[in-house]
Structures are given as C-alpha cells and as structure tokens.
Amino acid sequence: MKLTFLGANHEVTGSCTLLEAAGQRYLIDCGMEQGKNVYENQPLPVAPGEIDGVLVTHAHIDHTGQLPLLVRNGFRGRIYATKPTTQLCSIMLRDSAHIQEFEAEWKNRKAKRAGAEPVEPMYTVQDAEAAMQLFRGM
C-alpha cells in the first residue's frame, strides 16, 4: 500500500490523498484550497481517468471542492460518502459552482476593461451535477 499526500501539505485546506493498493487507486477526499485565489489550485499529478474511486470523509469544501473538476477532467469512478455527507455535498458543490461562475464573470468584466485574457470558472453547476451522479451513499 502506498499513500501520496497531494493536498493539505503546507496548510490545512485542500485535503487530498492518493491511496494505491492491489492495483487500484483511490483518492481520500478531493478538496479545494481556500484562503487564496481558487484559480491557483493545482491539477492532480494522476490522470482523473486512472482513479478508481474517491472516499469522502466529510462534506466541507476543503475536502470535496475539487470533485466537480475531477469529473470534468475525466473521472468516471464512484464517489463514496455517508448519506448525510452526500446530501450536504449536493447543496455545497452546487453552491460552490455558482460562486465559481460568478467570480469568473466578475473577473472577465474587469479583464475586458483592462484588455486581459478571460478566465474560465474552475467548474460549473453542470460539472457539480455530473459529480453528484457518481456519489454512492453508504
């Protein structure tokens, strides 16, 4: 068994650990870093399509906030969480997506005036809804 700490290495947010055992790869959480520009969140060093599943410890965004991005980038495995965590994630991930879209829109209005390149939201409500389809409540 091998554990690789991918997030929350230098601070407490962005929890994400890769568990490799018996030829399978699972993430333990897939959280968003908070407290800085969310556009600085780094991609995973593992292709999302190579991950077999995600185990979610709880619904906080610093433990679940990059799940929609993971799905957007090709993850098709299952996301395992308790039923209450799944219910909370349904609300929180959609809300986070709304915030991502709003912030991108706001930054793009400023960028247009400054002649800068537009930015994309980290993920959209549609991405959050796609992620929710992969949840399996336990």
Predicted regions and their residues:
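Short N-terminal micro-motifs specific to bacterial/archaeal maturation
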Residues: 10, 79-80, 119
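Active-site metal-binding motif and surrounding structural segment of the metallo-beta-lactamase
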Residues: 37-88, 94
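Metallo-beta-lactamase
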Residues: 96-138
